[in-house]
Structures are given as C-alpha cells and as structure tokens.
C-alpha cells in the first residue's frame, strides 16, 4: 500500500503540456465501450494484440489460483512449496522489470510479445508434466520473466497503435479481459476434477503453445511492431 501511495505522490507534480479534449463525457459508458470494441474489431493489428492478451490471460493469470491444488495433487507437497513458486515467479518479474527499465527490449516489442507468450505457455505445460519440486519452483522464474515482458510489450504496443481519442476506451477493453480469470480458472479446475490437475495443465499449456507458435508464424504485422 505504501508503494502505491508513493507512486501516486510521484505522479502529482507531473506536467502534461499536450492534451486533447475528452469526448467520453458526451456519451454513455456503454456507447464508449462499444466504440472501443468496434475500433478493435475493425483494426486488425489491434485485434491481434488483444487476442494475444486474451490467450495470456487464459493461461498465465489462473496459475497462481491453481497453485494450492497443483502443489498438493501433482507435487504431493505442502503450502510452503506453493509459496516458493510464487517467490520464484516474483523474482522473475522483478528481474524483467530491471532489465526493461535499464536496457529496454533487445528485439522488437511485437516479437517479444509473441515469444514470451510461447515461453510462458511452455512453462505451464512443463508444470503439468513435472513431479519434481526443484524443477517446478525454478521454472517459475521463467514464468515471471515471460509474463512481465509480455504485459509491458503488449500494453506498450496497444498504447502506441491506438489514437489518443480512443486510448481510454481501448485500454478499458484490454483490462476487462482480467475479469475472465475466474472463468478460465473454473474451466481448468473442472477439467482437473475429471482428468487430474497435471493432465489438465499439460493439455491447456500445450494448446496455448500451439496457438503461440501459430501466431508467431502468421502474425507478421505483430512481429514487425516496435
């Protein structure tokens, strides 16, 4: 909470020399949402960026919610191992933040989004196959690196592509996808109840890997974004 308050205080002295008059107040929230959705569906690059984030939300985001069941059923371990996995993921995320803030991206941001979607999905798949605690804990560092790089690169490209007048509307749609996390978690959980957590994670991870590789091959316009 202190860090959030500190961030807000640091934003207060910022000066914004350029600003366009907002048009959102002239319409209802629903019409603003529909306007953002229409823009996303009409502009192919934006739709593809949103699609990548949709897959990321469906695979990466539910992982933390699944850890208690995963550590108990797949690893036959206690809650301490789940905590260790979360810590490892946090280490990866902080490391990614340090790398991006210090040196930026070493390749184009669009390519970063596509590659990290694949690597994060691979981690999800490996976790489903793993029964080795050390592997499961260690590989979460890669998940943290992948997720942080994906979110920053994908969101940066969204902000770069969208016009100023629609930035708030489109960003809202991007964040609305976070509301789907409980649904994705429910689907994975129900599948795990039928075939086991390990198999469910392996299947969902493999599907995400296939989608990621397919997007990497066919989304040339995304690969070239920087």
Describe the role of every protein-language-model region.
Residues 3-27, 217-226:
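Helix-loop junctions on the cytosolic side of multi-pass membrane transporters
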Residues 17-51:
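Juxtamembrane intracellular "pre-TM" segments in multi-pass secondary transporters
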Residues 3-5, 34, 41, 60-226:
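C-terminal transmembrane bundle of multi-pass solute transporters/carriers
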Residues 48-57, 174:
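Alpha-helical segments in transporter systems
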């Amino acid at each position: 909470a202190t860090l959030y308050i500190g961030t807000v205080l640091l934003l207060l002295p910022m000066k914004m020399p350029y600003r366009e008059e907002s048009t959102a107040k002239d319409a209802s929230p629903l019409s603003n949402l529909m306007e953002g959705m229409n823009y996303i569906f009409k502009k192919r690059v934006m739709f593809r960026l949103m699609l990548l984030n949709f897959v990321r939300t469906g695979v990466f985001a539910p992982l933390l919610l699944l850890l208690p069941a995963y550590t108990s059923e797949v690893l036959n371990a206690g809650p301490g191992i789940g905590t260790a996995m979360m810590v490892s993921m946090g280490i990866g995320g902080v490391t990614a933040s340090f790398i991006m803030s210090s040196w930026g991206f070493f390749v184009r941001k669009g390519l970063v989004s596509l590659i990290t979607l694949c690597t994060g999905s691979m981690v999800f798949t490996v976790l489903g196959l793993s029964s080795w605690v050390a592997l499961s804990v260690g590989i979460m560092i890669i998940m943290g690196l992948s997720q942080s790089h994906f979110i920053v690169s994908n969101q940066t490209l969204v902000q770069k592509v969208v016009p100023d007048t629609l930035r708030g509307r489109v960003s809202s749609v991007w964040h609305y996808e976070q509301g789907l996390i409980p649904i994705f978690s429910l689907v994975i959980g129900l599948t795990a109840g039928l075939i086991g957590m390990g198999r469910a994670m392996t299947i969902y991870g493999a599907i995400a890997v296939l989608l990621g590789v397919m997007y990497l091959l066919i989304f040339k316009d995304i690969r070239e974004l920087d």
